[in-house]
Amino acid sequence: MTWRERAELRIGISGMPGVGKTTLVLKIAELARSRVKVCGFVTVEVREGGTRIGFDVVDLANGRRMALARVGRGEPSVGKYVVNLEACNVISEALRRECDLKIIDEIGAMEFKCKNFGEDLQTALHTSPRVIATVHRNYIDIAKKLGLEIIWLTRENWGLVFRQLLIQLGLTQ
């Protein structure tokens, strides 16, 4: 079965911090790029001297990177992080872009601080043929209501989940 013959796919990857959710979607995006148009965004940790100081958002279509959150005081905030609302533009543009495989990393509290995130997310899920999203464990119920099939990722099942997703996406030889 070719990529084009694959049915629509809506997968949400959730799990505890550090199990490799972002790594998983980045590897899938990397493999898919040679066959199809990939878009969306990832949220990557920013570390200084081994300590996490925040997160950047990266648009997968054009590589645009912007600070999403940093340790500090101010509003809006999520835990010890202050969210940079200017980064919401990167997220919004990534969600609105048309492509064959959309990566959304992540559906979580920081992203929902963006005014249009919920609306842009719903539009992306209804208009994109294939979506793989990472989902913060506190947002699983919301993700299910949006139509995502949730897979719980662990360090132990990472390889199996990766292979299953490659098969579902038609990315295996």
From Swiss-Prot:
One Pfam short name: NTPase_1
Q: NCBIfam families attached here?
A: PRK13695.1
The record ties this protein, via InterPro entries, to: AAA+_ATPase, Nuc-triphosphatase_THEP1, P-loop_NTPase
Q: Which UniProt keywords apply?
A: ATP-binding, Hydrolase, Nucleotide-binding
Return the protein name.
Answer: Nucleoside-triphosphatase THEP1
Organism source for this protein? Pyrobaculum aerophilum (strain ATCC 51768 / DSM 7523 / JCM 9630 / CIP 104966 / NBRC 100827 / IM2)
EC class of this enzyme? hydrolase
- Record-linked PANTHER family: CANCER-RELATED NUCLEOSIDE-TRIPHOSPHATASE
